[in-house]
Amino acid sequence: MEGSINDARRTNYLVLLRTCYEIYGIYEPLLALFAVYSVAVVVYRLYLHPLARFPGPKLAAATGWYEFYHDVFRGGQYLYEIESMHRKYGPIIRINPHELVVNDPDFYNTVFVAANTRRTDKWSGLEGIGLRGSLAFTRDHDLHRIRRKRYEPFFSRLSVSRIEPIIVDEAKLLAKQLEASSKTGRVIELEHVMSAFTGDVITTLCSEKSPDMIRHPEFGKGWHTSLYNFPSCFRAGAFNSFLEYSTDHINTAKREMLSVDKLEQNNKSSVFRYVLSTDMPQAERDTERLAREAALLFGAGSVTTTRFFSVTIYYTLRNRQIRDRLSAELKDVMAGYPSTLPTWQELDRLPYLHAIVKEGLRYACPFVLSSSLAAWSSLSHKFSSRLSYGVMRHLSRISPDSALHYKQWTIPPGTPVGMSSYSLHTDPETFPEPFKFMPERWLGEYNPKMNRSWVPFTRGSRNCLGMNLAYAQIYWGLAVMFRPGGPRLELYETNESDIRPVLDFLGPLPKSGSRGLRVTVS
């Protein structure tokens, strides 16, 4: 009996081997062709590619899997690998088969230029997250310029001043809700609160309808989780839900446009209504494309400013001297609160508050997505949900028509060239003790190179569209929270390790298990 079983097993093994051999025989030519093709690609990239002569690891030049490995399998570590490359190879390096990165603040204004200086295209390596066709992910320079012009009037300094009452009302409600929490003694996830504040503002500006997250018992927890849980947010279900939310707002705006007089249409009562009222080609009015645009506005208008608040409030609460000095400076200008109030430009002129904002933005500028993480986000990999520092990953720009020149190097037209504001903001030669939060570095006479290297909103034709809106929210958020008589916040079981980044995923992440910025209100 046992011999029969062994014979049967042996027969099965032989059948399996024969099947594998037959399959191999069928696909052998294809496998051989693939092997030859792969070798040819590697040889081309290493020896014949226009970037072949640029310094950097040969493995990184040969394949994008090198970047993928450090970002995905090592857990967001390619930033640090790039820093190691710079130490070994110099300020200009090839980090993958197609892309260069330069670490030199004097070169920043060569890469990030105004639209009338030269054409600047977007690096297509960022298209994997599902927002293709939106403003920030528009590759072509001319199309980007056309799309951006539709939004610029709404986000100008003058327009933001016009809608400042909306921001002020939300800031007052923010302070009121925090003060109400003092009666309960509850521990508050301040990131959820600030997500509610920024989310209510951007949604109101875009659609004239506030979701009133700031009034919710859990504030903006769901909104915060959806936006901060990047790449898992881009799993099909989660991302589709967010797009459906954006699509609803676009469809509502379109219906409203049909029901109002044409003379009333070209007004700035909301971003969506204003953009839809412009002379936009029909292809640009496609609901799916506009929904992606809306998703980008909702996300970028909330995530980046919330991260600023998280970092800046943490360091302000941790250092009593900073908090007391800020409160003292706000005493006179906020004395008439809540009836008589300054403008955000007047708040901007307060020296110490201005210094805190600049230092906070040095720490907490917007995030950027790498090409390998863009690809991985579409594969549903899930990471931690908290972001708390500034740009760690480089942003890349393309000069499609003309070569760029860096020292002895000539960079061919069409080459993505990246630079990282994280590297600029943490350069010890420009910012001594760069990992210390020191607003005083921006007071009095300071090194002019600090302004040269301070690029939280980037520069050039693709700089941050919502910069003025961000400033208005930032100044009002800090003013209502740290004014004398305002809500008295105290850190609760939160230390720097809950804030400081150790992983680079889309934006930076703190340690695994971080509980974020938690406070109590007294």
Swiss-Prot record:
The keyword Coiled coil does not apply. SUPFAM superfamilies: Cytochrome P450. Heme binds at C464. One of its GO terms (biological process) is terpenoid biosynthetic process. Pathway: Secondary metabolite biosynthesis; terpenoid biosynthesis. Its cofactor is heme. It catalyses: stellata-2,6,19-triene + 3 reduced [NADPH--hemoprotein reductase] + 3 O2 = stellatate + 3 oxidized [NADPH--hemoprotein reductase] + 4 H2O + 4 H(+). It comes from the Eukaryota. The keyword Heme applies. GO terms for molecular function: heme binding; iron ion binding; monooxygenase activity; oxidoreductase activity, acting on paired donors, with incorporation or reduction of molecular oxygen. InterPro entries: Cyt_P450 (IPR001128), Cyt_P450_E_grp-I (IPR002401), Cyt_P450_sf (IPR036396), Cytochrome_P450_monoxygenase (IPR050121). One of its GO terms (cellular component) is membrane. It holds the Pfam family p450. It is found in: Membrane. The chain crosses the membrane at residues 23-43. It is an enzyme of class 1 (oxidoreductase). Keywords: Glycoprotein, Heme, Iron, Membrane, Metal-binding, Monooxygenase, Oxidoreductase, Transmembrane, Transmembrane helix. Its EC number is 1.-.-.-. Glycans are attached at N267, N451, N495. It is a single-pass membrane protein. Cytochrome P450 monooxygenase; part of the gene cluster that mediates the biosynthesis of the sesterterpene stellatic acid. The first step in the pathway is performed by the stellatatriene synthase that possesses both prenyl transferase and terpene cyclase activity, converting isopentenyl diphosphate and dimethylallyl diphosphate into geranylgeranyl diphosphate (GGDP) and then converting GGDP into stellata-2,6,19-triene. The cytochrome P450 monooxygenase Stl-P450 then catalyzes three successive oxidation reactions on the C-20 methyl group to generate the carboxylic acid of stellatic acid. This is Stellatic acid synthase. The gene is Stl-P450.
